[in-house]
Regions:
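Extended, low-polarity transmembrane helix blocks
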Residues: 1-37, 55, 66, 73, ...
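Membrane-interface interhelical connector segments
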Residues: 34-60
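Short hydrophobic alpha-helical membrane-embedded segments
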Residues: 60-67
Length: 166
């Protein structure tokens, strides 16, 4: 436990987590903003939100990418860092099981989808159809990094990415 605490005190894991999660959320949020119709269709594939009234699913398709971009900006700038890390942790805690459940629901629907790791699906992240297992691994890694950013006690690299700025 002491080694982890010493590593955290350097601020480097926090900086690493902020950069990786921040740029990932920025990239995927921008992808969704650039094609809201495709994002709406991928949300519909999950069958988690009611189709009626339509303003609910449409609102999520419009607002969620902007939340992701705002969280990315906060993580990268260090402004409201814990709030942004809480949001990204919460979003990943919802997205990851949803991707898993989508993958499970598609097993056996095509001859090539014999197991979860065979499934290729549009996860809704903005990158099109991707293999489910690597996406789950990526999301779990992002979730751990986001949790690190949330729980880190380091006082280094809490502001901007450039020391003394932000």
């Amino acid at each position: 436990m002491g080694a982890i605490r010493n590593l955290d005190a350097t601020g480097l894991p926090l900086l690493f987590a902020r950069i990786i999660v921040g740029f990932t959320f920025l990239y995927y949020g921008a992808q969704k903003i650039s094609d809201p119709i495709a994002f709406l269709k991928s949300i519909e594939a999950y069958n988690m939100l009611p189709a009626e009234p339509s303003w609910i699913i449409n609102g999520v398709a419009v607002i969620l990418p902007w939340i992701e971009v705002l969280c990315a900006g906060a993580l990268l700038s260090g402004i409201q860092l814990r709030a942004a890390a809480l949001w990204t942790t919460g979003l990943l805690a919802v997205f990851t099981p949803a991707i898993y459940l989508l993958g499970v629901s598609l097993v056996g629907t095509k001859p090539e989808f014999q197991s979860l790791c065979d499934v290729i699906a549009d996860c809704g992240c903005g990158s099109g159809a991707v293999p489910v297992c690597p996406k789950l691994a990526t999301n779990c890694g992002l979730l751990l990094l986001s949790l690190w950013a949330l729980l880190s006690r380091s006082t280094r690299f809490r502001g901007g990415l450039i020391p003394g700025v932000g």
